[in-house]
Amino acid sequence: MDRRKFLFGAAGVAAAAQGGAAFARVPAAYDWGVSPPRGTRDAFVEWMVRNRGEDPRFLGERWDRLQQLISHQDVWDEADIRAYLMTPREDFVTAENLDRAYEWHHLNIGFGVTITGPHTVARMTNTLAVRRSDRVLEIGTGSGYQSAYLSNLTPNVFSIEIIPPLAQRTRALYDRLIAEGYSEYRAIRTRNADGYYGWEEYAPFDKIIVTCGIDHIPPPLLQQLTPDGIMVIPVGPPGAQHVIKAVKRRAPDGSVSVVRSDIYGGAIIPFVPFTGTHAS
């Protein structure tokens, strides 16, 4: 059975879990003005089954994880909560980790890299304060989950992956999901390159998110960030990074400064290492 086909309605939720036979495809149209209900778990699951054709089991896990994200103050903005709820994390993990899609932990996706835990993705993304008009650059496409999440916040998402086969695999995944009805992923432009140098062709960017650890802020990324733009980046030695919010300020005389703050209050949050010719 195609995992993207499920029954309509409340009765359909239970029947779908039992292998029901009446199916509905995901609508091709994407409406920025529509959000799933947040009153109850059942209402959310029913709405998503009816309107997005997703698996009620994973929808329930997504809902449960959201409650923990909110209680831990990993997500707080309504637009970011909507983006989290609209992004099926289960589509971006490997088959062997499907049952663990919404666990707190980073999960292996091959090529020596991981999909970041949902709590860290949520906090880093919420810290960016993405507006609909923003242009957002991601360094480290990885599984594709982060940019999929961002595509529910802005239609201007750019993502760079340095590992060629991973970049190809994730681009193919986006294209498959677009064909299945996730038209919001058309907003994601991808590139196989060294993210240290950013993406000058599409610069400047209002927001930049880096999903791998490095011991300094790459100057090309700072140059491609707009004045008052925000970068969220794990900075520090291997395995001992602090997730930094860096805000670029430009004085009247043209000088540039960076205002830094630690979004985890000094806690160490380990990330896979930045790779490339200027990784450290």
Regions found by a protein language model. Name each.
Residues A11, L85-R89, T226:
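Short amphipathic alpha-helical surface patches that mediate protein-protein
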Residues V26-R132, A267:
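Class I SAM-dependent transferase core
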Residues G236-S280:
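Active-site capping/gating segments
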Residues A129-R250:
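Conserved nucleotide-cofactor-binding alpha/beta core module
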Residues M1-V13:
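N-terminal secretory signal peptides and thylakoid transit peptides that target proteins
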Residues A22-A24:
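Boundary at the C-terminal end of the N-terminal hydrophobic targeting segment
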